[in-house]
A protein has these predicted regions:
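Conserved Rossmann-like nucleotide-cofactor binding loop
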Residues: 15, 37, 277
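Mobile amphipathic helical/loop "lid" adjacent to a hydrophobic cofactor/ligand pocket
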Residues: 72-198, 203
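Helical element adjacent to the flavin cofactor pocket in flavoenzyme catalytic cores
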Residues: 203-260, 265
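Conserved flavin/dinucleotide-binding core of flavoenzymes
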Residues: 113, 118, 334-443
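Mid-domain catalytic core of redox enzymes
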Residues: 2, 245-378
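Conserved FAD-binding subdomain of flavin-dependent enzymes
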Residues: 44, 50-92
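N-terminal Rossmann-like FAD-binding beta1-loop-alpha1 element of flavoenzymes
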Residues: 5-31
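Glycine-rich FAD pyrophosphate-binding loop
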Residues: 24-48
């Protein structure tokens, strides 16, 4: 009897998991993961804290440190996947706050929850720069909504910094709203954000309801942590290998050779569901086109700290939000990496009264006694070179039995990674002969 084809999937983030799940009944899948857990940015940590100040009963519960939320409008594939897997979800929110040093000393704090939190600092009511920021915010929303509805954003390849200057948006708007908001979305530095193409920003923000006051999407989170969907996918795979870094991939006339520390195995096809630079490093025989595309995407390293030190949040509790941006006092630190504090109690249903926070690139020292874990993540930088490279990816797919998948092919989010994994699986499935498919199908 004909053996079903062997497919190697390198990387067990959302893209690799999606591809493996989609192909599990069509081929013999081997899923390789270098780290000690499956999921990539879908990473849940179990921590134990007392229920409250009045009830010291310790409760262990999962919290997410990477992928946290999705919405009901722009994540159609993820919604279908969760429904198919029977994943339980809960309501979440996308509230946003800013902490920044004022030019004349002191500290600015505001949050976009409601009018009261916008003016959490009553002095902002009489601050011309702050009021100018709000006026610019409304003008920015009107302008970008008009551009998006006209469908002309694709013509705007200019960097964001030039766009803001050309339309005379003030420094307060840029530093106290726009760059903080973009930093929360893409987890990259101010210098990198100002180099983003305008089209990318407008299209994403319009689709996600970020530049409109009404009719915004509803955000949700996985109840108990994203590991629940990861575990359901992994449970359906026969051959999955943790702590098994792939060292080299070589394409031959007979298939694809995958080398690990345990030896070299031959597969009929391979899906590289890793960051583009990692895929480039794994391939020992890249074509000029592969080298050009995979080498065009840059990544921003970000250090995440899971902790309970609420001192990093705005001083006024009324200004606390789900996403809390803190501007570095030294501009050179701000231009290097963005600082964000995710208040998990607002993002996920947690059983503790105590604030639980993930701080990305903290600018202030966190009390070591309150640190529970630390992680490092890399996020794609979607500059013009990256956008151009994305357009060339389809021409690479299937060449020498190799496929690529990753969130770097889109906006860098969970839906983008899922979409890329499903697309790679669909393309590969089309290359399988009917005999291959029959060999895997149950009798």
């Amino acid at each position: 009897m004909t053996q079903p084809p062997r497919i190697a999937i390198i990387g067990a983030g959302i893209s690799g998991l999606a591809a493996a799940h989609a192909l599990r009944d069509a081929a013999r899948i081997t899923l390789f993961e270098a780290s000690d857990y499956f999921g990539g940015h879908a990473h849940t940590a179990t921590i134990e804290l007392p229920r409250s100040a009045r009830d010291a009963t310790p409760i262990a519960h999962g919290v997410d440190t990477g992928f946290l939320v999705y919405n009901d409008r722009t994540y159609p594939n993820l919604i279908r996947l969760f429904a198919d897997l029977g994943v339980e979800t809960a309501l979440s929110e996308m509230s946003f706050s800013v902490q920044a040093a004022r030019d004349n000393g002191g500290r600015l704090e505001w949050s976009g929850n409601n009018l009261s939190t916008v003016f959490a600092q009553r002095r902002n009511l009489a601050d011309p720069r702050f009021l100018g920021m709000l006026a610019d915010l409304l003008r920015f929303n009107r302008l970008t909504t008009r551009i998006a509805q006209a469908g002309t954003e694709g013509e705007l390849a200019q960097p964001l910094g030039e766009f803001l200057d050309a339309h005379r948006f003030g420094a307060a708007f840029r530093d106290w709203y726009f760059l903080p908001m973009m930093g929360c979305i893409w987890s990259c530095s101010t210098a990198q954000m100002l180099a983003f193409p305008v089209a990318t920003m407008i299209r994403f923000c319009h689709n996600h309801g970020l530049i409109q006051i009404a009719n915004r999407p509803q955000w949700r989170t996985v109840r108990g942590g994203s590991r629940h969907y990861v575990e359901k996918i992994v449970a359906g795979l026969d051959d999955k290998r943790l702590r098994t870094p792939v060292r080299r991939i070589t394409r031959t006339d007979e298939g694809v050779l995958v080398a690990t520390d345990a030896g070299t195995e031959r597969f009929d096809h391979a899906i590289l569901a890793t960051h583009s630079d990692q895929s480039l490093a794994l391939l020992g025989d890249t074509s000029p086109a592969e080298a050009a595309v995979l080498g065009a995407i840059r990544y921003q390293p970000n250090h995440a700290v899971l902790h309970t030190d609420a001192a990093v949040l705005p001083q006024r509790r009324s200004a606390w939000a789900a996403w809390n941006y803190q501007r570095a006092v030294a501009s050179e630190r701000e231009s290097g990496r963005v600082c964000l504090h995710y208040l998990l109690n607002k993002l996920q249903p947690l059983p503790w009264e105590q604030p639980v926070i993930v701080s990305l690139n903290p600018v202030d020292e966190i009390q070591r006694s309150q640190v529970m874990a630390e992680y490092d993540y890399d996020h794609p930088v979607l500059d013009l070179a990256a956008i151009r490279a994305q357009a060339e990816v389809p021409a690479l797919q299937g060449q020498r039995n190799t496929w690529f998948a990753g969130a770097w092919m889109g906006y860098g989010f969970h839906e983008d990674g899922l979409k890329a994994g499903l697309a790679a699986a669909e393309g590969l499935r089309a290359h399988l002969s009917p005999i291959d498919a029959m060999a895997r199908s149950p009798a």
